[in-house]
């Protein structure tokens, strides 16, 4: 069977930037585990805040965490209370000084993470998987995407045998390196087990001269 390379990993260094911007030699493994802990903690704490990408930069005993979110108000909280509490928890988790940047995603329908999360939450609320995918595709195309492809895998409608079913509209040129393709996968916890949701969104071409660190803005 044909296997597909990760669309974002294939474009890193060409039209996409790294989500972790630091260099280390002996401390590499420690920093990597710390990055994973930060990402897991933030996604758990801000599960309802429409968090997409988490970028991490490092200096000496300092960690800069950039959160791309469609709901910046929810992340910041009243008078900055939520973001201050999050910063304090991350300081305790890492033992370092953590600085948090909040970047608003102005067009969430062009962000694969948020579209996939929306489909997954609908599946958990027992919305039909075909309907959830088709509605997401319509919203994304209306938002200005050149193409979108979605796929839901697992025990669809509670079937005994797991299968995959997907839909697409427009073009999604996975082999074109200058094509700005956002990709994400999410999980939906249903009464019949987990369903996997994959989303590919083609947002147009990006020339290597002007790298797109995070689209949808």
Swiss-Prot record:
GO molecular function terms listed in the Swiss-Prot or TrEMBL record: mRNA binding; rRNA binding; structural constituent of ribosome
This protein's UniProt keywords: Ribonucleoprotein, Ribosomal protein, RNA-binding, rRNA-binding
Gene Ontology BP term (one): translation
Domain KH type-2: 38-106
Domain of life: Bacteria
InterPro entries on file: KH_dom, KH_dom-like_a/b, KH_dom_type_2, KH_sf_prok-type, Ribosomal_S3_C_sf, Ribosomal_uS3_bac-typ, Ribosomal_uS3_C, Ribosomal_uS3_CS
Position of the signal peptide: none
PROSITE patterns: KH_TYPE_2, RIBOSOMAL_S3
One CC-aspect GO term: cytosolic small ribosomal subunit
SMART domains associated with the record: KH (SM00322)
Family matches, as NCBIfam families: rpsC_bact
Subunit structure: Part of the 30S ribosomal subunit. Forms a tight complex with proteins S10 and S14.
PANTHER family membership: 30S/40S RIBOSOMAL PROTEIN S3 (PTHR11760), SMALL RIBOSOMAL SUBUNIT PROTEIN US3C (PTHR11760:SF19)
UniProt family annotation: Belongs to the universal ribosomal protein uS3 family.
Function: Binds the lower part of the 30S subunit head. Binds mRNA in the 70S ribosome, positioning it for translation.
This protein's name: Small ribosomal subunit protein uS3
Naturally occurring in which organism (per UniProt): Streptococcus sanguinis (strain SK36)
